[in-house]
């Protein structure tokens, strides 16, 4: 069979893949919450996968000059902060393999650390949910101000 269809299921070792039909956009978050691991593509799905608090693999859209791999590596470095080195390595190897740099043989290392990666994903989602956009923007502008020699005071005065 050349093409997988909704309802098909495949397995190899501990990996089980279920081909699901497309769902309405309104139900996409529910689908992400229901899966053990999510494979996502595109920025909107990437953000939603982070909010879902489940391990995910980001298949980033290719860009000219390989810029997409720089974005992927930058995000992985940030996302993997706080993970034990072996778990960070397993996640990074699978993400890179899935995006064409390396092999997908990294699956076994990833799968062995699935419980730890699940906890990390939940913690990441909690940190994202706990941040206040207005306060984050203020912190950002304070940092920019420091770099440029400005000081932001109460009342928004420079």
Model-derived features: where do they sit?
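N-terminal start-of-chain detector that recognizes signal peptides
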Residues: 9-13, 28-29, 110-111
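Short hydrophobic/aromatic-rich motifs at helix boundaries and adjacent loops
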Residues: 17-19, 43-47, 109-110
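Nucleotide-sugar donor-binding patch of glycosyltransferase catalytic domains
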Residues: 55-101
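C-terminal amphipathic helix plus adjacent low-complexity
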Residues: 81-158
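Nucleotide-activated donor-binding/catalytic signature segment of Leloir-type glycosyltransferases, i.e.
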Residues: 2-22
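A donor-sugar binding/catalytic signature common to diverse glycosyltransferases
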Residues: 24-71
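Short charge-dense sequence patches
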Residues: 17-29, 89-90
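Short acidic (Asp/Glu) and glycine-rich catalytic loops that position anionic groups and cofactors
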Residues: 12, 50-56, 114-119
